[in-house]
Amino acid sequence: MSPEMGELTQTRLQKIWIPHSSGSSRLQRRRGSSIPQFTNSPTMVIMVGLPARGKTYISTKLTRYLNWIGTPTKVFNLGQYRREAVSYKNYEFFLPDNMEALQIRKQCALAALKDVHNYLSHEEGHVAVFDATNTTRERRSLILQFAKEHGYKVFFIESICNDPGIIAENIRQVKLGSPDYIDCDREKVLEDFLKRIECYEVNYQPLDEELDSHLSYIKIFDVGTRYMVNRVQDHIQSRTVYYLMNIHVTPRSIYLCRHGESELNIRGRIGGDSGLSVRGKQYAYALANFIQSQGISSLKVWTSHMKRTIQTAEALGVPYEQWKALNEIDAGVCEEMTYEEIQEHYPEEFALRDQDKYRYRYPKGESYEDLVQRLEPVIMELERQENVLVICHQAVMRCLLAYFLDKSSDELPYLKCPLHTVLKLTPVAYGCKVESIYLNVEAVNTHREKPENVDITREPEEALDTVPAHY
């Protein structure tokens, strides 16, 4: 066998074949060389911008979104590394001539980059969000060199804001509660933080259209009033841009609820397209009274194409919009069956679903993973809107709730979304405030916990142990 046809080694994460390392590749490994960058290489998303420009807000939301669509993503917040290294006293730590502090900050950046490498190359991560100011060309060059050496793609997100009102609101909402300012006087916090911003302004070098024309980036001006996008390289970067151009910070609430109890719910049958039960109709009117009591301005109402959500919305007496994407998960051959019937006719399928409920796909039907992909346009539109009431179904509501509450794929299929209960979601600084409102109309329980025994050879009694009661 010729040297050129030597052993091939598959890289576990990139799923591609590269020549096995040998003595002849010494030149390729010399200092300053880089790993080849492939189409599906891991990506580093690098935040850029002065303090109080919403970088951590963007990092958190983007990470939540990418994880939800199935792209393993993690935030590396440099402020946390700095707080672990040294306790914060005041803005003087960030003075450009504080050489001791500069060295500490650089060491923190290197420690964070080491963790980024471990995550992307050894923990099966695909996107690392490097959340820091990264305001100098020197710091960005350090990151670019690091990415080149490890074969990572780089995408910059720069948040630029010159509106004093927006900056002040960001400081009020986020920085006053920062670990740097625990138990500090409000006015002193504001004064110190504004001086910290001034320290960064001295050496701030924004991404430049000419000098950085070879880089991939998006510049966001004044919380989304204007955008500049340059050299988007791949699918992940294009989805990132699309997502960032849809989010906003306008105060609003999203109301999630299921349809009223249906005739098939009462009988313990999944799926189907039945109408509301007597109690389901009572709930529809209770929902109308609740929504009216909230005094919500410009409320939009969305339903699926299914009879039970439409009947629930009709009681509101307001215009509503039907989304096919909001239809319940397709149970395929198991549509309109009870869990007992599924266990009787398809015991192996029933066990396989219990083993991996998120990825299991019903024969001729869908999985929760499929449902998440179907619901992505709904999430995008929810991010664009202000006040919305979504009347949907159990599996659909679980997927939407998992997005807003940052739940993993293992947790998602078991989130509790009871009938006749409204969840009010109000976005806050780095997450979502949840209020659960039960509207005092009884309904059957449709929630089935994961049974202890998920083996295919289990007894029927073990398989049906967590099935809720029904008529």
Curated annotation (Swiss-Prot):
Enzyme Commission number(s) of this protein: 2.7.1.105, 3.1.3.46
Modified sites of kind Phosphoserine: S33, S141
Ranges where the record places region 6-phosphofructo-2-kinase: 2-250
Keyword Cell inner membrane: no
GO biological process: fructose 2,6-bisphosphate metabolic process; fructose metabolic process; gluconeogenesis; glycolytic process; negative regulation of glycolytic process through fructose-6-phosphate
Function: Synthesis and degradation of fructose 2,6-bisphosphate.
Name listed for the protein in its UniProt record: 6-phosphofructo-2-kinase/fructose-2,6-bisphosphatase 1
